[in-house]
């Protein structure tokens, strides 16, 4: 059965027209939430999805537009079904996620004092594919974003690249397509300005046509519509639409 992708949001961190760049990945009867940003709970409500319909969450890196909704998710599950959400995460993100992001809101003396007390934490290792469900395999690929802050893009079922926030890595993209059989690329984009911590549209336009033709763009700013027709062989992902992969 083919995978399906539904972006809860396609916006950059400061976008207001679009929700945070988070996604639902459907693999058979398994639903994975890729990142859970500040707007994720509202986006789920908007498309009529309950947190109870999410089988697991995977976090790519620690910024508010990717983890800011985890506190609400944890509390809604705690006071709903009572089931801990399954959380897939790189080992080196566990401590900063708890200590720097979630501890203040979720900790409770004598009851909750670690990430494991509120989530069913399942560690992922960089470059080691993990079978998350019968029809879903995910490999973490570390990609540059903020110096000193780990960030992981995803290689899904040995054929789909889903970028985290990242600076331009043309060699990686070409290697995935030409050597590893990648056929779809969901890539973040910064439409204007210098790409200090993101990949710019101009950088992506420098890629060979064969690579561009496999790219759908996400994590864009509110002026996205004015760039229609100016993205070469690439197109924009639309939030809430379901894409068969």
Swiss-Prot record:
Region (Beta-lactamase-like): 19-219
Taxonomy, superkingdom: Bacteria
Binding site for Zn(2+) 1: 65-66, 165, 219
The protein's required cofactors: Zn(2+)
Statement: the UniProt record of this protein carries the keyword Hydrolase: yes
Cofactor comment text: Coordinates 2 Zn(2+) ions. One protomer coordinates the metal ions and the opposing protomer provides the catalytic residues required for cCMP hydrolysis.
Sites where the protein binds Zn(2+) 2: 61, 63, 145
Gene3D superfamilies: Ribonuclease Z/Hydroxyacylglutathione hydrolase-like
Known catalytic reactions: 3',5'-cyclic CMP + H2O = CMP + H(+); 3',5'-cyclic UMP + H2O = UMP + H(+)
Keyword field: Hydrolase, Metal-binding, Zinc
Additional observations: This homolog of an antiviral immune evasion nuclease may be due to cryptic prophages, or it may play a role in regulating the endogenous antiviral defense system based on cyclic nucleotides.
Protein family (similarity comment): Belongs to the anti-Pycsar protein Apyc1 family.
Protein purpose: Counteracts the endogenous Pycsar antiviral defense system. Phosphodiesterase that enables metal-dependent hydrolysis of host cyclic nucleotide Pycsar defense signals such as cCMP and cUMP.
Subunit structure, interactors included: Homodimer.
Protein name: Anti-Pycsar protein Apyc1
């Amino acid at each position: 059965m083919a995978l399906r992708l539904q972006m809860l949001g396609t916006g950059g961190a400061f976008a207001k027209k679009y929700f945070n760049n988070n996604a639902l990945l459907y693999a058979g009867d398994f639903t994975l939430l890729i990142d859970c940003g500040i707007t994720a709970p509202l986006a789920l409500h908007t498309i009529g999805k309950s947190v109870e319909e999410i089988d697991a969450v995977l976090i790519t890196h620690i910024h508010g537009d990717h983890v800011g909704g985890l506190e609400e998710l944890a509390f809604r599950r705690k006071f709903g079904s009572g089931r801990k959400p399954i959380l897939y995460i790189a080992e080196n993100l566990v401590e900063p996620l708890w200590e720097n992001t979630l501890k203040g809101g979720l900790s409770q003396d004598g009851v909750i004092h670690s990430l494991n007390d509120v989530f069913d934490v399942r560690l992922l290792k960089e470059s080691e594919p993990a079978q998350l469900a019968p029809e879903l395999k995910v490999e973490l690929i570390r990609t540059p974003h903020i110096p000193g802050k780990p960030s992981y893009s995803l290689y899904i079922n040995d054929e789909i690249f889903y970028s985290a926030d990242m600076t331009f890595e043309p060699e990686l993209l070409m290697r995935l397509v030409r050597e590893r059989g990648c056929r779809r690329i969901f890539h973040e984009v910064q439409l204007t300005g210098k790409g200090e911590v993101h990949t710019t549209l101009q950088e992506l336009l420098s890629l060979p046509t064969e690579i561009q033709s496999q790219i759908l763009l996400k994590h864009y700013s509110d002026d996205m519509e004015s760039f229609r027709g100016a993205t070469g062989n690439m197109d924009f992902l639309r939030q809430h639409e379901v894409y068969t992969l």
